[in-house]
Amino acid sequence: MFNWVKTAMLMAAITALFIVIGGMIGGRSGMMFALLIALGMNFFSYWFSDKMVLRMYNAQEVDETSAPQFYRMIRDLATRANLPMPRVYLIDEDQPNAFATGRNPEHAAVAATTGILRVLSEREMRGVMAHELSHVKHRDILISTISATMAGAISALANFAMFFGGRDENGRPANPIAGIAVALLAPIAGALIQMAISRAREFEADRGGAQISGDPQALASALDKIHRYANGIPFPTAEAHPATAQMMIMNPLAGGGIANLFSTHPSTEERIARLMEMARTGRFE
């Protein structure tokens, strides 16, 4: 229930941002047009944002025939978590990473890069995918996917206002300062993501994933490897769509600038420390 409230609040905040931008671009008529666009985007994001994100990453669906070991691993973990079998996707990227998407557990999908399959052992891979299924189980994936697509749309609209300017309700060119102000709304979109996708949720998914797999040490080892490789291997698609970075198990962006803006992940060191404490005590709290 809490995530439904959080999703509604996120949609309302983004709708308000669309209206503000519309007003700066086209006055009162721009506000009305932006409201209609926002309502359409909210509807689209709820029903289709998962498909959009998978298409952005050119994710290819696999099954037991095309990726037998990986597919069976997901099926086993989903059974352990008492979840429906999600759709399974692979992304042809060298950087090791993974994410989950979908509006609920009955319409969920998990995706992993080909790079992560090369880098991690089977045991570590189970830890990673259990983490993603924990996001599914706790219904984190709807707000993650909606915030990613809507924040991208906000940034695009803000950039449009910056470069093409706007008109007031009398048809006169808008104040150029307003265009600059609109452009500043792109960072606000990033801030919205940080508010909506709290770092506490990553800790919770680590804990839940450790419970599902029964092996917190495997996830800790996987996070250490992913962190080291992710810092040295670019992820062009994630860099082109930085609002989607918060969906990944590890921030796929290089340090600085945009990476800090969209940094919704807690430090890898702290995540590993918590997992190792779980392994030491046997308590998943």
From Swiss-Prot:
Keywords: Cell inner membrane, Cell membrane, Hydrolase, Membrane, Metal-binding, Metalloprotease, Protease, Transmembrane, Transmembrane helix, Zinc. Binds 1 zinc ion per subunit. One of its GO terms (biological process) is proteolysis. It comes from the Bacteria. Its cofactor is Zn(2+). Gene3D superfamilies: Metalloproteases ('zincins'), catalytic domain (3.30.2010.10). GO terms for molecular function: metalloendopeptidase activity; zinc ion binding. Its main location: membrane. The active site is at E132. This is Protease HtpX homolog. It is an enzyme of class 3 (hydrolase). NCBIfam families: PRK01345.1 (NF002363), PRK03001.1 (NF002826). The chain crosses the membrane at residues 7-27, 29-49, 146-166, 177-197. Its EC number is 3.4.24.-. GO terms for cellular component: plasma membrane. Pfam families: Peptidase_M48. It is found in: Cell inner membrane. The keyword Transferase does not apply. Belongs to the peptidase M48B family. Zn(2+) binds at H131, H135, E202. It is a multi-pass membrane protein.
